[in-house]
Amino acid sequence: MTNYLLTNNKQPITNNPSRVALVIQYLGTHFYGWQRQPQHRSVQEEIEKVLSTVEHQPVTLHGAGRTDTGVHAAAQVAHFNATSSIPAHRWAAVLNSRLPEDILIRASALVAPDWHARFSASWRRYRYTIYTDACPNLFVRPLSWHYYHAPLDESLIQEALTPLIGKHHLAAFHRANSGRSHSWVDVQAAECYRNGSFIHIEIQANGFLYGMVRLLVGILVQVGRGELQPKHFTELWVNQRREEVKYAAPAKGLCLLRVGYPDSPFPPDAWFDTQPKFLLPQLMG
């Protein structure tokens, strides 16, 4: 039996490359985002280095989305073309044996040659976590925004979020110089709920503008503490008043929760538990 974890020896090369998809988790604390960039550590580059070592040739990894510096992922999706004879379902184990501890491959699967992690996706879902207890928690700190300065009313935040559902021009929550040609977003779900000392804001859309969720949360906190009425929040983005959106919530509270596909190539257990406790077991109840 071939031991595919022993990748120091060159694997047999196949004539026809196969396309392999991955479900990836990472803690974004020590990364300058997903995308490869000179002189900075990125998730894409860390995985590509291992893939290239195993494949004995340069390998490019294509992600479903580009998370920013400090943003986490519970289920990023990416694909690459493999020429070695390693079965697609074994790539998760092969990679996990070599990757640093802040990256984990949840699953790997064979996909069609024209399948694309980004362009085949129909939606992405992000969650932002706010920790509201006045007492600091070391284990919670890397994964949430510790906000205890004033009480937050999650029902007011939900009232503000509901009108966002639908296709809208959200230029008010779009950072400048992003390179995107338009700011239309089809928001499929937007919800805010409390779990003990944690407030979670989840948004699902066909795509996201650069910095969109963090800018949204930054002003939704004003709604939650009663400084901005929900209807004024709606007027702000309807009238594209970008100059009034001045603060982005810290990156560490944001997590790419899941990427949706019409026909998912992954088994159900590839997706991590999407309940609020999935990132902080025993700490969020």
Positions of PLM-derived features:
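Structured-RNA-binding interfaces characteristic of tRNA pseudouridine synthases
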Residues: 5-6, 15-285
